[in-house]
Each structure stands twice: as structure tokens, then as C-alpha cells.
Design a protein with these regions (language model features):
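N-terminal, polar/charged subdomain of small-to-medium soluble alpha/beta proteins
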Residues: 1-111
Length: 111
């Protein structure tokens, strides 16, 4: 399991333990899938017509942020964590494939 620090904030609302557990589990899955991740900060808040969720994640050569809105708090949290997973996948693949392209280029130059 990764050592990523997860901070979950409920802004201007009472804590919903069901949503907290869902977010903690999803963040732990993200941290396991992307070991370069060191910190995830999740903020959940009501807005005029539903709920707002935002996430900021940092790590080694990685920084992502996203936000989402939905009528239900759990749905907003799911949406924003799906967006962050997509962003982390793009960053992760970019780092891996950049290194592979460099190695391939160096091997071709060495011939």
C-alpha cells in the first residue's frame, strides 16, 4: 500500500461517514495504482443546486487538480475522482513512454 496522505474536508456541511469511507477507499486505490502520488486533498461542499467536489493531488513529478458538481454528494465525489484517475493515467503514461522513447532513440544512435 502506498504512503500517500489523504485529507478529506467537508466544507459548510456535516460529515457523511458513508461518503468519507467511499472517498478514502477510492483515494487508497489511486495511491496504490499511482505510487508516485504522495498527497491527495479532497474538498466536498454544498453549492446552490447540489454538491461540489474538488481534488488536488501531488507527488513526484506529478500535480493534478479537478472539480465536479452533481446533485448528490457521493456522485460528485465519484465524478471528481474519476477525472483525477484519468489525469493521473495520462501523466503516468507520459512519463513512462517518454523514458522509453528516449531509451529507444539512444539505442538507435549507438548503432
Amino acid at each position: 500500500m502506498s504512503e500517500a496522505v489523504v485529507a478529506i474536508h467537508f466544507k459548510d456541511m456535516s460529515v457523511d461517514e458513508t461518503v468519507r469511507d467511499l472517498v478514502e477507499r477510492r483515494c487508497a486505490d489511486l495511491a496504490d495504482e499511482f505510487p508516485e502520488l504522495t498527497h491527495l486533498d479532497v474538498t466536498l461542499a454544498p453549492d446552490g443546486s447540489g454538491h461540489h467536489a474538488s481534488v488536488h493531488g501531488t507527488g513526484k513529478r506529478t500535480e493534478v487538480a479537478s472539480h465536479a458538481q452533481a446533485p448528490a454528494l457521493g456522485h460528485a465525489a465519484d465524478l471528481v475522482l474519476d477525472q483525477v484517475r484519468h489525469q493521473l493515467r495520462k501523466v503516468h503514461d507520459k512519463h513512462i513512454y517518454t523514458q522509453r522513447r528516449r531509451a529507444k532513440h539512444r539505442a538507435e544512435l549507438a548503432r
